[in-house]
Amino acid sequence: MTTVLEILDVSKCYGRRNRVCVLSNINLKIQRGEFAALIGSSGSGKSTLLHIASLLEVPTSGTVVLNGTVCAPASDKTRTMMRRKHMGFVYQFHHLLQEFSVLENVMLPQRILGHGASTAESVAAAILEEMGLQDKAECRISELSGGERQRVAVARGIVNSPTIILADEPTGSLDPQMSKAVFSVLHKHVKAKNLAGLVATHDRTLAKQTDRVLSLSGGMLTEL
């Protein structure tokens, strides 16, 4: 299988005088077609590792490689370009724009990449249909249930056909039934499109549905 994301000897420390390291010599590979889960207690560094993997945060030391390109250490321009071109994101709190319709929210990543309005609308509409949200396209975010909002967030995260999807506690604010449904949508999309996926979650039951479970504790990463 093709390696999409590779993290090599990555550490992340904060502070100078009272230095605290939340990640220590992390090594991780995510392959195309693989959906992996990252588990750990609150404060274990899951979000920090995901931010580094998504090129939003720079490691103190180590290397991050995305699709064969070294993205850390690298310039801000390189990280931004690679992130926009190859990555899709889903967060616990959806960050959807309240003043936009569902369709306009999902179109936004396409527009950021420079696609015209008609192309962006066509692609976004197709993704919403895949999510079973075609009837909600013209709705405002405030009109949706929590589960529907999170499915819109998933749609927005995958609309640009990213090489890898990174999700940080995407079901943390949902009830168990809706959590399972949203998690299933992510999993199925990764498999159907032969993408790579890494999801941070505190839900071990959901984590067991993935191809591989990784545990972060004391700044160290182990595979379960």
Swiss-Prot record:
Job of this protein: Part of the ABC transporter complex LolCDE involved in the translocation of mature outer membrane-directed lipoproteins, from the inner membrane to the periplasmic chaperone, LolA. Responsible for the formation of the LolA-lipoprotein complex in an ATP-dependent manner.
Keyword tags: ATP-binding, Cell inner membrane, Cell membrane, Membrane, Nucleotide-binding, Translocase, Transport
Enzyme class: translocase
GO cellular component terms given for this protein: plasma membrane
Organism: Anaplasma marginale (strain St. Maries)
EC number(s) stated in the UniProt entry for this protein: 7.6.2.-
GO biological process: lipoprotein localization to outer membrane; protein localization to outer membrane
Topology of this chain in the membrane: Peripheral membrane protein
UniProt-listed InterPro entries: AAA+_ATPase, ABC_transporter-like_ATP-bd, ABC_transporter-like_CS, ABC_transpr_LolD-like, MacB-like_ATP-bd, P-loop_NTPase
SUPFAM superfamilies, per database record: P-loop containing nucleoside triphosphate hydrolases
Localization per Swiss-Prot or TrEMBL: Cell inner membrane
GO molecular function: ATP binding; ATP hydrolysis activity; transmembrane transporter activity
Complexes and interactors: The complex is composed of two ATP-binding proteins (LolD) and two transmembrane proteins (LolC and LolE).
Main location: membrane
Family: Belongs to the ABC transporter superfamily. Lipoprotein translocase (TC 3.A.1.125) family.
Residues noted as binding ATP in the record, renumbered to the chain: G40, S41, S42, G43, S44, G45, K46, S47
Protein name: Lipoprotein-releasing system ATP-binding protein LolD
UniProt keyword Cell membrane, yes or no: yes
Xref: PROSITE patterns: ABC_TRANSPORTER_1, ABC_TRANSPORTER_2, LOLD
Domain ABC transporter: 5-224
Keyword Nucleotide-binding: yes
Top-level taxon of the source organism: Bacteria
